């Protein structure tokens, strides 16, 4: 039976309201604030100290003890170093997925259950657990599934798709049935107006409000290279480092009638291939190679293992619509995704996240995306128009 719950308290309204809801349900609640980035670093501009003060204030109002854990070294090793390595290799990483996998739902989760001896962990994520918002169904011995929340606009299952099934089995999402507006209304009702009015954090914490190109140049040395037209092979401009660009990004090259967009990056030669036009075939893909998936749904994993293929739904950006797809295993044991409709700017290093109608099934890092062949492009460009605008 679940009695004692550790809540990851960030200083924001969502985690504070989650702690309130847990206390109202009668759980013994312990708040823990995670410090993952060292603000002494001259580049990082996270609002860590202000967030800590807000977390302390919220816990005082709730009568909940607050402790701190420091994962700065572990975050640097497991998340930030990987982030830099990927950019130097021409990839575009997702540090939020890595942070959830390695820090919040691994180190922190284990600390809460094994070191502190608590029964479960709760977070302020907008997601649902099939065992219940408060793990009411944990005694059933059923596997937990990561379900889409009531507030589909705030859905954060995309960023949780890399966590382990073991961690999910002992994780509560008290906000799973709430709309964001309801959370803010409740916060005001219980005296948390200052948190309800607080601006939501967006983007990458360690970048803060800085321009990304300015930030990344502090860690990766610029290296001048060519922009090559992917059709003609002609040099149409120069860049100052492949780490400053991502697939689909507009290059803003002068002296050309049509705008150019990044189609592909080649780290070995420090070359960026660019395509003329927003929906150039080189920017559209239906076939994707991915790493072996991290499965949150054992049934889907078993279907793929038994039959060699799985019908599901796909996205690689959390704000984009889901697209039907088929995930398969090739004879060479490669995992392949075939989309029913082409998508624009599918980016190596990002994550393919798989869904059914109600749940997030798992995720896999994208290795490559094959561009549309020109002879098929005209009809498929029209098919893609509604998805890539």
Swiss-Prot record:
<keyword id="KW-0808">Transferase</keyword>
<dbReference type="GO" id="GO:0002143">
    <property type="term" value="P:tRNA wobble position uridine thiolation"/>
</dbReference>
<keyword id="KW-0820">tRNA-binding</keyword>
<dbReference type="GO" id="GO:0005524">
    <property type="term" value="F:ATP binding"/>
</dbReference>
<keyword id="KW-0067">ATP-binding</keyword>
<protein>
    <recommendedName>
        <fullName>Mitochondrial tRNA-specific 2-thiouridylase 1</fullName>
        <ecNumber>2.8.1.14</ecNumber>
    </recommendedName>
</protein>
<keyword id="KW-0496">Mitochondrion</keyword>
<dbReference type="InterPro" id="IPR046885">
    <property type="entry name" value="MnmA-like_C"/>
</dbReference>
<feature type="region of interest" description="Interaction with tRNA">
    <location>
        <begin position="154"/>
        <end position="156"/>
    </location>
</feature>
<keyword id="KW-0547">Nucleotide-binding</keyword>
<feature type="binding site">
    <location>
        <position position="34"/>
    </location>
    <ligand>
        <name>ATP</name>
    </ligand>
</feature>
<feature type="binding site">
    <location>
        <position position="124"/>
    </location>
    <ligand>
        <name>ATP</name>
    </ligand>
</feature>
<dbReference type="Pfam" id="PF20258">
    <property type="entry name" value="tRNA_Me_trans_C"/>
</dbReference>
<dbReference type="GO" id="GO:0000049">
    <property type="term" value="F:tRNA binding"/>
</dbReference>
<keyword id="KW-1015">Disulfide bond</keyword>
<dbReference type="GO" id="GO:0061708">
    <property type="term" value="F:tRNA-5-taurinomethyluridine 2-sulfurtransferase"/>
</dbReference>
<feature type="region of interest" description="Interaction with tRNA">
    <location>
        <begin position="317"/>
        <end position="318"/>
    </location>
</feature>
<feature type="binding site">
    <location>
        <begin position="8"/>
        <end position="15"/>
    </location>
    <ligand>
        <name>ATP</name>
    </ligand>
</feature>
<dbReference type="Pfam" id="PF03054">
    <property type="entry name" value="tRNA_Me_trans"/>
</dbReference>
<dbReference type="InterPro" id="IPR014729">
    <property type="entry name" value="Rossmann-like_a/b/a_fold"/>
</dbReference>
<comment type="function">
    <text>Catalyzes the 2-thiolation of uridine at the wobble position (U34) of mitochondrial tRNA(Lys), tRNA(Glu) and tRNA(Gln). Required for the formation of 5-taurinomethyl-2-thiouridine (tm5s2U) of mitochondrial tRNA(Lys), tRNA(Glu), and tRNA(Gln) at the wobble position. ATP is required to activate the C2 atom of the wobble base.</text>
</comment>
<dbReference type="GO" id="GO:0005739">
    <property type="term" value="C:mitochondrion"/>
</dbReference>
<feature type="site" description="Interaction with tRNA">
    <location>
        <position position="350"/>
    </location>
</feature>
<feature type="site" description="Interaction with tRNA">
    <location>
        <position position="125"/>
    </location>
</feature>
<keyword id="KW-0694">RNA-binding</keyword>
<feature type="active site" description="Nucleophile">
    <location>
        <position position="99"/>
    </location>
</feature>
<keyword id="KW-0819">tRNA processing</keyword>
<feature type="region of interest" description="Interaction with target base in tRNA">
    <location>
        <begin position="94"/>
        <end position="96"/>
    </location>
</feature>
<comment type="similarity">
    <text>Belongs to the MnmA/TRMU family.</text>
</comment>
<dbReference type="InterPro" id="IPR046884">
    <property type="entry name" value="MnmA-like_central"/>
</dbReference>
<feature type="disulfide bond" description="Alternate">
    <location>
        <begin position="99"/>
        <end position="205"/>
    </location>
</feature>
<feature type="site" description="Interaction with tRNA">
    <location>
        <position position="250"/>
    </location>
</feature>
<feature type="active site" description="Cysteine persulfide intermediate">
    <location>
        <position position="205"/>
    </location>
</feature>
<dbReference type="Pfam" id="PF20259">
    <property type="entry name" value="tRNA_Me_trans_M"/>
</dbReference>
<dbReference type="InterPro" id="IPR004506">
    <property type="entry name" value="MnmA-like"/>
</dbReference>
<dbReference type="InterPro" id="IPR023382">
    <property type="entry name" value="MnmA-like_central_sf"/>
</dbReference>
């Amino acid at each position: 039976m679940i009695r004692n719950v550790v809540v990851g308290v960030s200083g924001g309204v969502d985690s504070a309201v989650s702690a309130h809801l847990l206390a109202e349900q009668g759980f013994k609640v312990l708040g823990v604030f995670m410090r993952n980035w060292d603000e002494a670093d001259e580049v990082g501009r996270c609002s860590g100290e202000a967030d800590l003060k807000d977390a302390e204030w919220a816990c005082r109002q709730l009568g909940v003890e607050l402790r701190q854990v420091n994962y700065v070294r572990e975050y640097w090793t497991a998340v930030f170093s990987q982030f830099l390595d990927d950019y130097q290799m021409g990839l575009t990483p997702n540090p939020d997925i890595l942070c959830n996998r390695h820090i919040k739902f691994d180190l922190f989760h284990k600390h809460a259950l094994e070191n502190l001896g608590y029964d479960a962990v709760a977070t302020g994520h907008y997601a649902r657990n099939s065992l219940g918002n408060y793990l009411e169904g944990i005694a059933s011995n059923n596997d937990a599934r990561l379900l889409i929340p009531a507030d589909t606009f705030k859905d954060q299952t995309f960023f949780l798709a890399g966590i382990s099934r073991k961690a999910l089995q002992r994780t509560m999402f008290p906000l799973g049935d709430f709309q964001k507006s309801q959370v803010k209304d409740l916060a005001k009702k219980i005296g948390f107006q200052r948190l309800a009015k607080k601006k939501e954090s967006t983007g990458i914490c360690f970048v803060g409000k800085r321009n990304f190109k300015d930030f990344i140049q502090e860690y990766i040395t610029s290296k001048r290279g060519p922009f090559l037209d992917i059709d003609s092979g002609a040099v149409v401009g120069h860049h100052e480092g492949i780490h400053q660009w991502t697939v689909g990004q507009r290059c803003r090259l002068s002296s050309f009638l049509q705008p150019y967009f990044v189609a592909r990056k080649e780290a070995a030669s420090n070359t960026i291939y660019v395509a003329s036009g927003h929906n150039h075939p080189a920017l559209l893909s239906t076939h994707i190679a991915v790493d072996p998936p991290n499965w949150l749904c054992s049934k889907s994993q078993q279907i793929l293992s038994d039959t060699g293929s799985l019908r599901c739904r796909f996205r690689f950006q959390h704000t984009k619509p889901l697209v039907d797809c088929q995930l398969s295993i090739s004879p060479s044991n490669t995992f392949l995704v075939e989309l029913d409709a082409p998508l624009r700017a599918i980016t190596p290093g990002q994550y393919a996240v798989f869904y059914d109608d109600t749940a997030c099934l798992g995720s896999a890092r994208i290795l490559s995306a094959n561009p549309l062949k020109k002879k098929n492009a005209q009809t498929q460009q029209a098919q893609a128009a509604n998805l890539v605008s």
